[in-house]
Amino acid sequence: MRSNENRAISIVQKDIEGNIFECTEGLSFWGGVDPKTGCIIDIHHPDHGTCLSDKFVLMPTSRGSCSGSGVLLQLAQNGLAPAAIIFNEMEEILTLGAIVADQLFKKKVAILRVPRDLYSALAMADKAEICENRLMFGSKTIKLRKLNIDTVNLNSKDKSILDGNHGAAQQIAMETICKMAVIQNANELIDVTKGHIDGCILAHDANLIFAEKMHQLGARISIQTTINAISVNRDNWQRQGVKPDFGNKASRLADAYVKMGAQPTYTCAPYLLENIPKEQEVIGWSESNAVIYANSILGAKTQKHPDYF
């Protein structure tokens, strides 16, 4: 049996301390946490009303919408994020949000994945601290293993991107992809031929800030990529009584992706467009219904990716 120290992984590192709060059930941050307050607003969740800000939040894994990554980024931007989120199962949505917050904006939310026995011991404690890659609570001190992206075998082009030879945006994207690969226990990457971007609605300013930051850094889309539905009728919102501040921000969000090379499709149903994926074609789609349709009806292959991925 491996020791807890070998199995406790620090995915996003931050020296921080705080009170421990155990979520009795998994939580969807999208629709479940208010990014303006940090409180749980899902009335069906047993911890409804609890504020997660500055706490060491324990939950087995998250659940629900892949847009939860954006909510965590907005919480980090607002200074209302949990101090740390600790999982004992595979988790990608909030993890990706924390990676993006760190990589692009230097807003850290500590993310750990620990074995279940250590998780249970943490749940019995009142406070915890992370310092110099060690987790401390009660009388215990656990050494945390850093995420090691060197375990991912890259081809020469991907290595060059990771080394920063193709610009900052590409380097950040490749490092993020490699981190997510390690989280999934993957040891190599597979090229995809098509993409579909979610996170295009102006649910909060984080979606806009992310897209414009990537464009500012020089990001360019390199495969056929479509865009999900947006928050306004791009051409007619001014005539529909939409408030100018909201309409302008929603338009800027859509325009940022188009400027990076995405097709202005603005649909949740990319499978109804021309040049749809073929059977066995490996693609990278977001938007839950599109992922289900692609895998089950078209026979293509895609994961359900979190927003920003």
Identify what each model region corresponds to.
Residues 2-136, 231:
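Feature captures the catalytic cores and cofactor-binding loops of soluble hydro-lyases/lyases
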Residues 15-16, 49-53, 78-81, 214-218, ...:
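Flexible, charged surface loops at secondary-structure boundaries
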Residues 99-114, 127, 136, 227-308:
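A generic, well-ordered mixed alpha/beta core segment in the N-terminal half of proteins
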Residues 30-38, 56-63, 166-176, 210-219, ...:
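Phosphate-binding glycine-rich loops and adjacent basic patches that engage nucleotide phosphates
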Residues 66, 70-73, 81-84, 88, ...:
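Glycine-rich, N-terminal phosphate-binding loop and its surrounding beta-alpha-beta segment
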Residues 144-151, 182-188, 220-230, 279-289:
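Short, compositionally biased low-complexity segments
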Residues 33-38, 67-74, 100, 143-145, ...:
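Surface-exposed beta-strand edges and their flanking turn/coil or helix-capping segments
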Residues 2-26, 138-217, 303:
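N-terminal basic/disordered segments at the start of proteins
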